[in-house]
């Protein structure tokens, strides 16, 4: 019931709720329409898929004629109709069903938002009504109470009037602005919904109208072909066929024994008689049985035909483009306990074991295709010759990986059959896939499980780092091997879905193996890579190791080995080992028995790949050069005594033909000796050790340089302190320190250049793989350089003494060695000592600074005499500094040029 405020009746305050209910009804109707569309599309799609299965399962009619052509047209038109229906349903789902579901969801969200706004508006309106009610009730209470104060009555009356005015204002605002705003938005939503539903209904009619039109067209085409059937012609052709069968046979004739035997008797006569009987029976062709020329009876309804076909299957090595059941039937006698095809196990294990077990780490495996000629050669060996032992040049990762993909893709039926193709693509987890997995054939289940385990191992992180084949790449590559889409229109659309399914299979390998365990009969361990696959240089399977002998050119030498006839007799049944001059198989015959010469040949019938590798042949003795025959035999026996047997003696035979000298044991190897893998590894290790030693030497030199720099800094600090303590004008010592530091830097640069030259020489030596010649130290050059240095020191000392004498300063010895070894010399003597080796010194060169630098770097006794020299030369240095300040740069440059003329000592490596 509506409430009252005085005589006024309050509204229900539920306008927005009523409008929202109407919108909700429209949304529910839209949902009902969408569900109808979805269910109709599902029914039509299932019906079309069932028609497709029916068309595929229907065989071709055996008899040709109008009826057969008409029926083929009906089947083909039905198949086209089903394909058209499936494409129409998929297009309708993309254009109508999926967008309509999203539209309804969005519409409900907006309606919910506006409903919340309406509820908030109703709460505000209710608060206004409640305030008006409370003010009116207070006013009535004050009026009815006679004891109430007049002032309070007037105050309550004014409040009541104000509340009435505010409530009226809010009420007008509510009906004019707030409620119409929400109503307009809700009306807009309803308008959009109605227009959207109208559009979808039109699309529904348009799409589904094309389905009966296509069906009517197919029925019309079939009807025209049925009307064109000429039954008279078909009946006439059948009658003619029957007439051709009623042909008279030749009459039987009496054959006497003499004519049968042909006068010769024996086997020849029996053979001719047998042939005549066969010819008679072959002419008769009684029933469905007849006899071929080779004597085999062919009967389409007899068990002999089935048994002969089984024998043909067993003798046929083909494993490509045939059903899995036929492959398993072929290998049952050889591998009775193997659950999957041997070709699959072989290729997978070759990929794992090639490149020393690093095959799965090969970059771009299964993505980079193998060479077409190599893949075809491998396929021909397996498919035509039944040979599972390949030549050395075909043991490569990419051709074998391509062969594995080719075998999977050439199977008549995919691993996941077409009847579960669509359902399997809808799987979102491995558990959903296992539901369909259990309905697959047992052989398909085991192959899928085995491949999933191999691919799971392939996408492990340690393999992906180098192979660059992660889970997505592997799933993309192997999706066509697991699944095949019959519809050309949906191949590109289902690429991502197929890849997702293969990823689920690879990741769920453990669950698949629990559902479908595999028995491999320990085949993995029996598959071995031949020894020649690891060595590229020595890729031949059989080699001849013989002794080298030199004979005259007029005679030919043939080495005959005992027991060769026995080997030749066994060659048809067992594979021959590599023939050598001295082998264990040849030591059984007596040593004195002569035997013919044997030419080593490469053996073709190698053992199967799944057998364990045989032990390597015994090594031959070292070659013999120009040794008498008795000594050769004695040396061979001594070399082979450790092997536990005595080899037969060598026998030489002379031939009359003039042939060039023969050297046995010379193989077609290159002229340069080929290093083995171990020797190459040792050389690499030696090079690495040399590089490490060089790096250590560099670090030690850097540490020494740092220590020298620290010492120099300490010396500089000490010189600064000494110069500040004595006098501020001691510039000669600072110049000497500067020159000494420059000289040290020059020496360090020279050392670095020498080291760089040595490094370049080492690199050249390593590049040419030639042993470098050891440099011979030249003693005369060392003596000559020492003499030049001594002369230079003497010249500097003499020049210093002359300059001090000219200035009137007392002379003081620079070093004890110079004072004892070099007395005072005249200027003419100085010139004579300078002229042969160096140009004469200029008059302005500073001898004091250069002598101090040389003495400081040559011996520790010179540094101890610095203080005495400074005390003696302090009064003179002040005057020299004032006179020679403009010439300081010339002096330093002259001394540097003089020092640069001294040749460096020869480098020794």
From Swiss-Prot:
Q: Which residues form the Rho-GAP domain?
A: 322-513
In this chain, the stretch annotated as Disordered covers: 529-909
Q: Where is the composition biased (Basic and acidic residues)?
A: 675-716, 742-765
Q: Where in the sequence does UniProt note compositional bias of the Pro residues kind? A: 609-625
Q: Where is the composition biased (Polar residues)?
A: 651-674, 767-785
One Pfam family this sequence matches: RhoGAP
Under the heading Gene3D superfamilies, the entry gives: Arfaptin homology (AH) domain/BAR domain, Rho GTPase activation protein
Gene Ontology molecular function: GTPase activator activity
Q: Where is the composition biased (Low complexity)?
A: 533-562, 571-602, 723-741, 786-828, 843-892
Kindly report the protein's main subcellular placement as a broad class.
cytoplasm
Q: What keywords are annotated for this sequence in UniProt?
A: Coiled coil, Cytoplasm, GTPase activation, Vacuole
Coiled-coil annotated spans: 672-809
Q: What biological function has been recorded for the protein in this entry?
A: Rho GTPase-activating protein involved in the signal transduction pathway.
State the protein's name: GTPase activating protein homolog 4
- State the species of origin: Dictyostelium discoideum (Social amoeba)
High-level lineage? Eukaryota, Amoebozoa, Evosea, Eumycetozoa, Dictyostelia
């Amino acid at each position: 019931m509506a409430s009252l405020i005085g005589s006024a009746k309050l509204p229900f305050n539920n306008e927005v709720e009523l409008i929202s209910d109407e919108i909700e009804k429209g949304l529910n109707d839209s949902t009902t329409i969408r569900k109808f569309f979805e269910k109709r599309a599902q029914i039509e799609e299932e019906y079309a898929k069932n028609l497709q299965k029916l068309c595929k399962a229907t065989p071709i009619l055996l008899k040709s004629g109008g009826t057969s052509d008409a029926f083929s047209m009906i089947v083909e038109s039905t198949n086209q109709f089903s394909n058209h229906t499936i494409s129409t349903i998929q297009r309708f789902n993309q254009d109508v069903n999926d967008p309509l579901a999203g539209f309804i969801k969005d519409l409900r969200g907006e309606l919910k938002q506006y409903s919340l706004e309406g509820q908030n508006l109703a709460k505000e309106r209710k608060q206004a009504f409640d305030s008006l009610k409370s003010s009116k009730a207070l006013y009535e209470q004050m009026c009815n109470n006679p004891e109430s104060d007049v002032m309070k009555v007037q105050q309550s009356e004014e409040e009541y009037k104000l509340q009435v005015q505010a409530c009226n204002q809010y009420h007008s605002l509510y009906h004019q602005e707030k409620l119409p705003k929400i109503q307009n938005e809700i009306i807009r939503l309803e308008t959009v919904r109605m227009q959207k539903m109208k559009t979808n209904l039109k699309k529904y009619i348009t799409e589904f109208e094309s389905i009966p039109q296509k069906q009517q067209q197919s029925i019309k085409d079939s009807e025209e072909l049925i009307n064109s059937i000429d039954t008279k012609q078909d009946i006439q052709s059948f009658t003619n066929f029957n007439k051709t069968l009623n042909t008279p046979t030749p009459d039987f004739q009496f054959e006497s024994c003499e004519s049968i035997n042909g006068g010769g008797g024996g086997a020849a006569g029996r053979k001719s008689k047998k042939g005549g009987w066969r010819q008679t029976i072959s002419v008769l062709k009684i029933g469905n049985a007849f006899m071929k020329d080779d004597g085999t009876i062919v009967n389409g309804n007899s068990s002999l035909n089935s048994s002969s076909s089984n024998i043909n299957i067993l003798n046929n090595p083909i494993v490509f483009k045939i059903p899995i059941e036929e492959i398993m039937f072929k290998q049952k006698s050889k591998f009775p306990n193997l659950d999957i095809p041997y070709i699959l196990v072989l290729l997978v294990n070759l990929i794992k074991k090639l490149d020393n077990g690093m095959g799965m780490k090969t970059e771009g495996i299964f993505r980079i295709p193998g060479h077409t000629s190599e893949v075809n050669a491998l396929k021909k060996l397996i498919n035509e010759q039944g040979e599972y032992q390949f030549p050395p040049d075909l043991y490569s990762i990419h051709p074998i990986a391509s062969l594995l993909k080719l075998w999977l893709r050439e199977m008549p039926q995919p691993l996941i059959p077409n009847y579960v193709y669509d359902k399997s693509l809808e799987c979102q987890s491995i558990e959903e896939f296992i539901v369909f997995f259990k309905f697959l054939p047992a052989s398909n289940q085991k192959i899928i499980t085995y491949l999933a385990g191999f691919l799971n191992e392939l996408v492990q992180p340690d393999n992906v780092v180098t192979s660059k084949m992660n889970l997505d790449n592997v799933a993309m590559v192997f999706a066509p091997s697991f699944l095949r889409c019959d519809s050309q229109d949906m191949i590109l659309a289902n690429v991502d879905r197929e890849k997702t399914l293969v990823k689920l299979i690879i990741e769920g390998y453990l669950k698949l193996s629990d559902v479908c365990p595999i028995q491999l009969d320990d085949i993995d361990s029996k598959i071995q890579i031949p020894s020649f696959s690891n060595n590229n240089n020595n890729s031949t399977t059989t080699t001849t190791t013989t002794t080298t002998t030199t004979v005259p050119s007029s005679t030919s030498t043939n080495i005959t080995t005992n027991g060769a006839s026995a080997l030749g007799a066994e060659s048809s049944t067992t594979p021959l080992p590599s023939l050598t001059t001295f082998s264990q198989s040849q030591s059984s015959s007596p040593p004195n028995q002569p035997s013919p010469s044997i030419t080593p040949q490469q053996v073709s019938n190698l053992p199967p790949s799944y057998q364990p590798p045989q032990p390597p042949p015994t090594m031959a003795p070292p070659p013999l050069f120009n040794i008498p025959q008795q000594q050769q035999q004695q040396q061979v026996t001594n070399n082979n005594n450790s092997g536990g047997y005595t080899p037969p003696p060598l026998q030489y035979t002379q031939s009359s033909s003039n042939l060039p000298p023969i050297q046995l044991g010379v193989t077609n190897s290159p002229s340069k000796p080929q290093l083995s893998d171990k020797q190459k590894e040792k050389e690499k290790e030696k090079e690495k050790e040399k590089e490490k030693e060089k790096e250590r030497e560099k670090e030690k030199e850097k540490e020494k340089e740092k220590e020298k720099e620290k010492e120099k800094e300490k010396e500089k600090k000490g010189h600064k302190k000494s110069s500040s303590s004595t006098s501020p004008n001691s510039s000669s010592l600072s110049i000497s320190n500067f020159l000494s530091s420059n000289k040290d830097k020059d020496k360090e640069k020279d050392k670095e250049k020498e080291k760089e030259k040595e490094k370049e020489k080492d690199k050249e030596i390593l590049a040419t793989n030639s042993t470098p010649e050891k440099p011979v130290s030249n003693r005369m050059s060392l003596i000559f350089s020492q003499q030049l240095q001594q002369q230079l020191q003497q010249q500097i000392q003499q020049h210093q003494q002359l300059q001090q004498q000219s200035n009137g300063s007392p002379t003081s010895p620079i070093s004890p060695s110079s004072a004892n070894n070099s007395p005072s010399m005249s200027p003419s003597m100085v010139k004579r000592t300078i002229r042969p080796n160096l140009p004469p010194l200029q008059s302005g060169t500073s001898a004091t600074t250069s002598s101090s630098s040389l003495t400081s770097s040559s011996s520790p006794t010179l540094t101890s005499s610095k203080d005495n020299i400074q005390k003696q030369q302090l009064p003179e240095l002040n005057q020299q500094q004032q006179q020679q300040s403009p010439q300081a740069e010339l002096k330093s440059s002259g001394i540097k040029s003089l020092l640069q003329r001294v040749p460096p000592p020869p480098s020794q490596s």
